[in-house]
Amino acid sequence: MKTNLLNITFLNFKSKLTLLISFGLLLLTLISCNKKAEETPAAEAKPAETTETAQVAPANPPANFKHATATVNGIKIHYVIGGQGDPLVLVHGFGQNWYMWNRLLPELSKHFTVIAPDLRGVGESDKPESGYDKKTMASDIHELVNQLGYKSINLAGHDIGLMVAYAYAAQYGDSVKKVALMDALLPGIEPVWSSVKASAWWFGFFGWPASGDIVKGKEKEFLTNFWPVVGHVKDPFTAEESAEFIRAYATEGGTTDAFKWFGAFDQDGKDNVIFAKKKLKMPLLAMGGEYFAAAFLKDHSKLVAENVSESKIAGSGHWLVQENTAQVQKDLLAFFLAK
């Protein structure tokens, strides 16, 4: 890896000052919400306007998809499934749920049977006390795939989902045809990991055991302040997407347990160092946003895989699917359909 990549901050489009300001705004928002609650007389107190009052039911996928659940590793995993052809499993990341893929489902389902789960810890999936290391979370997905009767799959993961997808491919490589890693990086894989960890303040905050309790009940304020920090396009989500993502994290335990994905990074790093001793052999697409992970993801992926190709999503920050839907769809289809 080139020397100049060692100093990439993972947010080279944002200065450290901008990150600190964003963090400060987040904390001020939380403090303001707490203060207003304390100052409101009991007789005038009103129920908070949460997504659970505004949107009780989960969002629906396209008409040719359905909601379903499966019990895997002793917990319930929710997923949507639809389409025809070979299976393609799509794994979401933090700040979103299965619905992050909704724009892509109509076209992808013309070519694949698409399965998009909610990871353990968020949305309609269970939220157990433990099991948030990516090795275990990958096992959840593998058990789901087995229950559905598939012997091999195509696989894509974004953000935390990238980490889960890698852990899946590393453990069950013989059953993965192709894998797309989208706009994040792998804990423990150096030299990039240490540089990113030092500059991405949310890694520490989210991994702090009390963080979920701080954000609980303020999911809308939290997410709407966080999304722009790692994005590039202004307001990339539709109102429906924002409402669904907020609702998914406002479910009981949603933020508390999703933050455990970050709390498991130390264990993930240990697991990844072991996984990386045997490089992935299946084709791997490193897909990064022009203003986010594209700066390093291809070289980073080559540390763990032998057959790496690249997709740089033009004009995009971290939220690839929403910031440049057309190119993401085009490049994923080109990769997964190529013989």
Give short role names for the model-derived ranges.
Residues M1-K2, Q267:
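Short regulatory "switch" loops immediately downstream of catalytic or recognition motifs
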Residues K2-L28, C33-D86, K110-F112, E306-S309, ...:
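Alpha/beta-hydrolase fold catalytic core
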Residues K14-K16, K35-K36, R120, K134, ...:
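Basic side chains
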Residues E44, L104, D299-H300, E323:
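Residue-level signal for well-ordered alpha-helical positions
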Residues Q55-A68, G74-I77, Q84-P87, I115, ...:
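Flexible "cap/lid" subdomain of the alpha/beta-hydrolase fold that forms the substrate-access gate
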Residues I75, I81-E124:
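Conserved HGGG/HGGXW glycine-rich cap/lid loop of the alpha/beta-hydrolase fold
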